[in-house]
Amino acid sequence: MNATTIALIPLLPLASFLLLGLFGKKTFAKSGGIIGTLSLTGSALLSLFTAYNYFFVTGKVDGVYQKIEVLKLQWLEFGPGVSIDIGLLLDPISVMMLVVVTFVSLMVHIYSLGYMKGEERFSIYYSFLSLFTFSMLGLVLSANIFQIYMFWELVGVSSFLLIGYYFNKPSAVAASKKAFIVTRFADLGFLIGILILSFHAETLDFGTLIQRLTDSSSPQLHSAITGGLFGISALTWGLLLVFMGGAGKSAMFPLHIWLPDAMEGPTPVSALIHAATMVVAGVYLVARLFPVFALSCPGALEVVMYVGALSALFAAVIACTQTDIKRVLAYSTMSQIGYMMFALGVSGYGGEHGLGFTASMFHLFTHAMFKALLFLGAGAVIHYVHSNEMGDMGGLRKHMPVTHLTFLIACLAIAGVPPLSGFFSKEEILTAAFHSNKLIYGIALFTSGLTAFYMFRLYFSIFWKKEFLNHKNDLNHIGHIEHKEAAVSPLSEGEGHGGEAPMTMKLPLMILGVMAIVAGFVPFGNFVSSNGEALHSEFHLSMAIAPVTFGLIGIAIALMMYKSESNLPARVSTALRGLYQGAYQKFYVDEVYVFITKKIIFNLIGRPSAWIDKNVVNGLVDAGGMFAQDSSDELSVWQSGKMQGYAIWFLVGVVALVVGFVFMM
């Protein structure tokens, strides 16, 4: 397999980033979008070629897909036998991720040509978008754990730049800082985790590390199991800390607080973050080290399972109460990522036991299609209505037929309605959960009903309910827009009111709509499994009945409550006031963090530290200065400035030296 071809996949977006970053403001001020889109087109085509070549030509040997390191270069050398390499690794999950990242990013690039048209920093936006894509592509191709950490951090920097793109909005600046800081804490855990694992495995290379930490006769595994703190092995600590990094990036509870605020960035950025880059990076990380989790440390994998299930349910409940269209989708992402995580948690290794692993990756693949479609559809609605609030919408199906149809397809897909893509991947996840842990299966089943409810609550509120034009022709009517993204983007200055979105925005919606339908028919188990062997999972009608039933019940309840004007939602929220208020306020997790930060860290740590710094550290420094000052004052009396005095002291010194010399003799 040609290393140059593989290397070009991330290098094309990197070239776009450098070109637009250095010369975009003046030279490519208007053509930056075309340059960025062409670079991603090249990367997407090369990714498809690579996927075909790997899956059907060179990747399988004796019925097993191999890990192929197509490029390996020595980067840093610290001494004989001690070095850090960089390389490009191809295996089923990295190749699958190449296709997902480049395809979704290409759709976002094309969509942004219309959505961001006229933006003052148009080329800079595409520069940041290219950097984001390069970072994620570098991450999924990384051949060793140190290399993945470098690109992991670069993904964080890219998200910081894009979330804070509207830097003149204080809320956007605050959101970008919040995302950066929260994920930094998680990334610290990730760094410590990879140091522990690489120290005991005595390597940074993924293949060697996994082999050594899963071989029962390996001295490295023995070292990792016997070492540790507080009765927990070093291997468990390492994997849990690595998962902490993944939980931060993937917005798992309780490290999810940055995700809703990240909606302050442009809507196409939200599509990329939620569908194909930042939030799926954590799932990819756990999948990359899955053999170690499953074979050597099932306790850590159980933590992944419970955190994923809790996050899925927690986010789904919150999404049922939110009124901002993008925040509903944000919590929807958190819930679906939770599905992927607990699917990994319930999975075994190899054969039918590895169904959860395949189902998780399958859901990552299908979710990328319909979640990108949902966010881009939301962007088209915001572009038309000039608001993020569901209360400012309604009846848009007549005015936005393409957006309406594609959004409906995406809602049906995420609700798990057959025969759309989400149905097949969710069915596999629920099957794996049913055979592994009945409690997790019950949580997943209930969450699937909530998912259908809140997505169709969103759908009916936007496209049905009251007529949009009856109450909303005047932009001055909008006095309570929370997000203000529409007010910042030039596209929101009336361009949308003439009709539906331009073709550059509709084309990605239509393509993603098709993918949301057909992606579920891919025989995913033939290509991606926990051990590289084909997994032929059979469809069981009995397993599909329950989730489909729960989904249809959720849709029916949303239909009764939100298809037309009704006081039923108000009555339900009043009857469930405590739960509703808790969910609407996101169960006060942000307030808990503020309390911990201000009351505990600031008062119990910050204030005492400040007192010690002021009175002890500065006191010692000031005391030293005062001693020097007093000493100089005392000694200054000897500095009379008279030559006679200096001559006398010189003579005294000479005599003292002579006397000392005589005594030494």
Feature map (PLM): residue ranges:
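Hard-cation-handling environments
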Residues: 502-555
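Transmembrane helix-loop-helix hairpins at membrane boundaries of multipass inner-membrane proteins
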Residues: 1-7, 22-127, 201-230, 288-290, ...
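Membrane-entry segments of alpha-helical transmembrane domains in multi-pass membrane proteins
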Residues: 1-11, 27-34, 82-100, 138-151, ...
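Alpha-helical transmembrane segments and their membrane-interface junctions
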Residues: 413-424, 428, 513-531, 597, ...
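Aromatic-capped, Gly/Pro-kinked transmembrane alpha-helices
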Residues: 79-89, 525-542, 561-665
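Alpha-helical transmembrane segments and their helix-start/interface "positive-inside/aromatic belt" motifs
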Residues: 29-42, 177-189, 398-406, 500-513, ...
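Glycine-biased, low-complexity coil/linker segments
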Residues: 493-496
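Hydrophobic transmembrane alpha-helices and their helix-loop junctions in integral membrane proteins
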Residues: 107-148, 157-488
